[in-house]
Regions:
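Conserved glycine-rich FAD pyrophosphate-binding loop
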Residues: 1-108
Length: 108
């Protein structure tokens, strides 16, 4: 948090090891978003290096979406996109998020 000058809240389920970092940012300021992205990248990389995952029982979240390939590889994310298209051929379910837009929703 200090290194990136952001506030991070961490909630979770200690009994099963699920931690949910939440980075406080002001979307009106690109610098705030940039710092949040950098902090989340560091958190995601460390979680994966320690044998963890980017997401447990909750969704992936817009800040972690750009790091899906780190965990699942290009082939895994490509499969996710194909499944999304199969179940949502018209792109009406959560349009532009995660498999279609990544960080765009954070900046908008």
């Amino acid at each position: 948090a200090e290194r990136h000058q952001v506030l991070i809240s961490i909630t979770g389920h200690i009994g099963d090891g699920n931690l949910h970092p939440g980075i406080i940012m002001d979307r009106r300021f690109p610098e705030s978003v940039r710092r949040a992205e950098q902090a989340m990248a560091e958190i995601a990389r460390e979680a994966l290096n320690l044998g963890g995952t980017l997401s447990g029982e909750h969704g992936i979240g817009l800040l972690k979406a750009p790091f899906l390939e780190w965990e699942f590889g290009e082939a895994g994310v490509s499969l996710m996109r194909r499944l999304k298209r199969a179940f949502d051929p018209h792109g009406i379910m959560n349009p532009g998020k995660i498999l279609g837009g990544g960080m765009a929703g954070v900046r908008d």
